[in-house]
Amino acid sequence: MMFPDLPNTLAVKGVQFKILGQVFPVLRHDVLGPLSNASLAAAMLRQAPEGAPADALQQRCQRLSDDVSAMLEEGVGTVRGLEQWLSDDGAVAAAADLLQECRKLVFSQLLLSRRTIRWPEQIAPAELPRFSSRYLALAWLLSLISELAADAELELDASEPGVWRARLPQYAADSAAQPPVITPREVELLAAAAGWRMERQDRCWSLYLPTHLTTGELLP
């Protein structure tokens, strides 16, 4: 039996795993944060204040117990959410929510590289397949960050329905710098696989959304 698309599928998966490796420290922090707080609250449960009235102790224990339960539920929910990075469950996300999530995930990359992104103030609404679109948006951003010189700013524009644009400053990164984490070719690979299209010009990289996913009205 022949599988003509298998090499392309494997290539897409390979790029997705590269991206996951880049954002995993942030995801790990999201998982460990609630669990660490729950451990602290559990330790406080074992250290009751001396001489406190019985009613106050009972209320304190109940409050801390509720906190532990809530934190554990949050941690479990975050762990389950990691599955959405490994397989497509068919979930959709609004364009604004997707870009906001990407903003959080690339924050450390920007901080360490001394680069900044001017995020769009208005975003044309679109409901996007979360799995493929999130990987594509992250690939686009990570590749663009590599194109920036230190202390440079990238400007994103998502106000026009059907297209996201990234405008690069005049000065690019030093050609002798480290190779990009994600290459433009890999961004194009993910775009084609997800039904998008990337267009690169000297100072502007544009991602064209699949036409059936755009709606038209601007969101703040």
PLM regions with names:
Residues 158-190, 216-219:
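Glycine-rich/acidic phosphate-handling loop/turn and adjacent ATP-lid/helix
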Residues 167, 203-218:
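Short C-terminal beta-strand
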Residues 21-44, 48, 127-156, 180-193:
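Conserved ATP-binding N-box helix of the HATPase_c
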Residues 116-128, 159:
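Conserved catalytic submotifs in the C-terminal HATPase_c
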Residues 194-205:
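Glycine-rich ATP-binding loops of the HATPase_c
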Residues 193-194, 213:
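Beta-strand-enriched, solvent-exposed domains that form extended recognition/catalytic surfaces
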Residues 2-5, 9-12, 16-23, 31, ...:
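Histidine phosphotransfer helical core of two-component systems
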